[in-house]
């Protein structure tokens, strides 16, 4: 089973949690896109849901495949969000944002009664931080914000490269018009403390640490999919 097949397996297992009539947050990224494709097949077969996308890219895919959508303002309270992750630890703390949609992903997840994470087994870690932490920042005062991120990290014993994410057209820009700094801190022993500290920086719009948000993870490996509960690796 290759990496894509594992993503499909995790996405397929997540469909078992989707019930007709649900208001569903729909994630962003390669694994979430596999879920959208499978969801579209269920919708075509009669499943009734209303989806809220976490990015313009996800919205376009849903429209192309016939998945009905509403805005979060139209459906401000959701039953379930299904999304991928770049890393997940044993407490279901996540690093997200590799796809550049972390702000909307976090807003949608926070509006949901439950959040299920789908991923292949390579995303499961003992301690977060091998994947660079995406930090969404306001373009105004970018240099100042970067310095404050460095100082804040240093107070927590963290250091590493802070790279402004690039696209083919220059600086990568989120759907909300912000930049992303990818912070290669390495091992993050206290994700909660870093989350609070980053949120205190005025130029930081949001960061990719998702703490106490996921209620279940579905992890796929060569032998199939398994569920991961908090502190049960």
Curated annotation (Swiss-Prot):
Keyword set includes Isomerase: yes
Residues engaged in binding substrate: 28-31, 83-86, 96-99, 123
Active site: 105
Keyword Nucleotide-binding: no
Domain of life of the organism encoding this protein: Bacteria
EC number: 5.3.1.6
Catalytic reaction annotation: aldehydo-D-ribose 5-phosphate = D-ribulose 5-phosphate
Gene Ontology molecular function, alphabetical: ribose-5-phosphate isomerase activity
GO biological process: pentose-phosphate shunt, non-oxidative branch
Keyword line: Isomerase
Entry's family note: Belongs to the ribose 5-phosphate isomerase family.
Function in brief: Catalyzes the reversible conversion of ribose-5-phosphate to ribulose 5-phosphate.
Subunit note: Homodimer.
Protein name: Ribose-5-phosphate isomerase A
Organism in which the protein naturally occurs: Rhizobium rhizogenes (strain K84 / ATCC BAA-868)
Gene: rpiA
């Amino acid at each position: 089973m290759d990496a894509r097949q594992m993503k499909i397996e995790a996405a397929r297992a997540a469909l078992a949690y989707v019930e007709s009539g649900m208001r569903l947050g729909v994630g962003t990224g390669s694994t979430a896109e596999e879920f959208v494709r499978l969801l579209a097949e269920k919708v075509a077969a009669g499943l009734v849901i209303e989806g809220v996308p976490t990015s313009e890219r996800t919205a376009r895919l849903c429209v192309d495949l016939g998945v009905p959508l509403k805005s979060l303002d139209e459906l401000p309270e959701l039953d379930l969000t299904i999304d991928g992750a770049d890393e997940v630890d044993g407490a279901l703390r996540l690093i997200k944002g590799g796809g550049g949609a972390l702000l909307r992903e976090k807003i949608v997840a926070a509006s949901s009664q439950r959040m299920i994470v789908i991923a292949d087994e390579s995303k499961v870690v003992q301690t977060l931080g091998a994947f660079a932490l995406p930090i969404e920042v306001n373009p105004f005062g970018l240099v100042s914000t970067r310095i404050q991120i460095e100082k804040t990290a240093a107070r927590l014993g963290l250091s590493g490269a802070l790279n402004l994410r690039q696209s083919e057209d220059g600086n990568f820009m989120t759907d909300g018009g912000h930049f992303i700094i990818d912070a290669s801190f390495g091992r993050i022993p206290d994700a909660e403390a870093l989350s609070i500290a980053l949120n205190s920086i005025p130029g930081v719009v949001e960061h990719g640490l998702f703490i106490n948000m996921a209620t279940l993870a579905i992890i796929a490996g060569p032998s199939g999919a398994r569920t991961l509960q908090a502190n049960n690796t």
